[in-house]
């Protein structure tokens, strides 16, 4: 067995508080304890700390010792067991092909996670353990309690500052989130709690258009680059900067073991595209895929704790010819795999024909569907075509089938869409897919900016998030060019946090503006450190400031390098206010000298 040090598994990952912030915990019922982040302001501000949503997990709590070889504390395990509807069992044996045809001695692979649980949980016979099932029965789970506190994020403290001036396009965002509201949104299928019973380390979160807009970050090894140390750190790094979920899109060797390391150390939901690993098991030959291989892969990943699966069940045989005249054809990896299988066998997609079988598996572990858009447009010229919308209609049909089994569903969306075609995508999804949460990749609004596609896509992401998309899948500067590294992940996450927040502001989320206004006051009052700390990326903000004004004293200066001390507009405005205030005092004195009468007698 390979030694950890030999395989470059990190003994540590990025930890410690985000600068200017501290981890706090808000207590709820039944032992619920919700992590949040507070940004402390300078005493001169005379303001309360700014409380913000936090998905960085224990990694930013200095009081918690992180040992990735031990994994995180199983936060939800007691809640799961207390419901009395699960059982442990002897899990499937790990096979060489699970790790990409590695030999039995694991030579050339990464070390397995220490003390792997070979007795996963599943629903007892006849039971259904999904959050949707509980919600339909009127049950408020501990997960729902946790989410309500988390989504409110101190709204009660900000009650006086609430502003509802946005355009929500029909979304129903209450002033305060209650556990019962969370339950009802889950029961109606308008929101998803992605929380596999075998991933108890995950902190409950919700994806739905009546909640904060969430973002996902993609990580993963590939056939040409595979380093589990980098993948674990990418996950930690992504959630540090605000990724609400992470998808492991590994396509190379060591897939199973890499995923185990990530899951055991992830406080956020983990999603996968199971067809990628299934393809590895048949040596990359799409035609050799079978339902049996795919089913085995689903169970393998379910036992590990994957929280949501992208399933390309909407790529039907009849739709494939509709892509023939596209500029870029089928750009989805999963979509192209299934299209090739359908054409090779001239049969209907086995993910479609076995969809109810997939539902039976998912409801035993509470895994959510992320119904894949395998026919999404790969360029703006292909946007909103017959192939794309035919698949979307099918995803709506499959959503109804999943809900019949009380399996949670979200719908994946494009892609590449010019700005004027974005809203029709959202409107059509709400109708065709019965208001199931929309989860979109961007969309990219132009195709001319390789190297800057985090920007081209953030434009579309902000717009579609405003219109109602529940979760945005990030795009990094490396999109279409190569695999993102650690720095690319940060840029992608911060860019998409910006897009999601802009959408929350536009939707009229009651306290979304609170952080903006706190930063604006800090900017006007030249509280530089508060400006840095309130930003989405404090390190970069301070670094840019210090490139021209590196002296520590410059952080107390009432100007910046752009205007200089003589031409700072905000400094001049402050002086104008002082002069105006002084003038008002003089007029007040004159008023008092003349007896304080409102109406003076007319002069004779």
Curated annotation (Swiss-Prot):
Catalytic activity: 5-amino-1-(5-phospho-beta-D-ribosyl)imidazole + S-adenosyl-L-methionine = 4-amino-2-methyl-5-(phosphooxymethyl)pyrimidine + CO + 5'-deoxyadenosine + formate + L-methionine + 3 H(+)
Gene Ontology molecular function: 4 iron, 4 sulfur cluster binding; carbon-carbon lyase activity; zinc ion binding
Transmembrane intervals: none
Gene Ontology terms: cellular component: cytosol
Keyword 4Fe-4S: yes
Binding site for [4Fe-4S] cluster: 560, 563, 568
A single GO BP: thiamine diphosphate biosynthetic process
Entry-linked Pfam families: ThiC-associated, ThiC_Rad_SAM
Record-listed E.C. numbers: 4.1.99.17
InterPro entries: ThiC (IPR037509), ThiC-associated_dom (IPR025747), ThiC/Bza_core_dom (IPR038521), ThiC/BzaA/B (IPR002817)
Chain positions recorded as substrate binding sites: 218, 247, 276, 312, 332-334, 373-376, 412, 439
Record's function text: Catalyzes the synthesis of the hydroxymethylpyrimidine phosphate (HMP-P) moiety of thiamine from aminoimidazole ribotide (AIR) in a radical S-adenosyl-L-methionine (SAM)-dependent reaction.
Subunit-level organization: Homodimer.
Name used for this protein in its record: Phosphomethylpyrimidine synthase
Organism: Zymomonas mobilis subsp. mobilis (strain ATCC 31821 / ZM4 / CP4)
Gene responsible for this protein: thiC
